[in-house]
Amino acid sequence: MSESVEQHWSVYLIRNNRNALYCGVTNDIERRFKQHQLGKGAKALKGKGPLVLEWSTSFDSKVTAMRAEYFIKQLTKSKKEQLVELKALIAVDDNQQVMFESCSQS
């Protein structure tokens, strides 16, 4: 018998020593961040530490997470900074439209 394991996917933003934000997707954020810190992740982050995991959010499917990642990568730097500052949530509706909303408290 095989047991179905529910897998969550995360989209994340990592800040490097040049203050740039890198966006990625993974099914294990702790493992992936450690890989980035060890220089075994994305080429864009190699040699640019220290790295800081600034923001992340989870999705129930890889497809949805990848759609959100694409959306974030299209944002301007200032919009990505808003995601971090506001601790915003990313949502994908039934029509596969991606949006973000603030969840910070005033």
From Swiss-Prot:
Domain GIY-YIG intervals: 7-82
Pfam families with a match to the protein in the record: GIY-YIG
Listed Gene3D superfamilies: GIY-YIG endonuclease
Family per record: Belongs to the UPF0213 family.
PANTHER family: UPF0213 PROTEIN YHBQ
UniProt-recorded name of the protein: UPF0213 protein VPA1222
Organism: Vibrio parahaemolyticus serotype O3:K6 (strain RIMD 2210633)
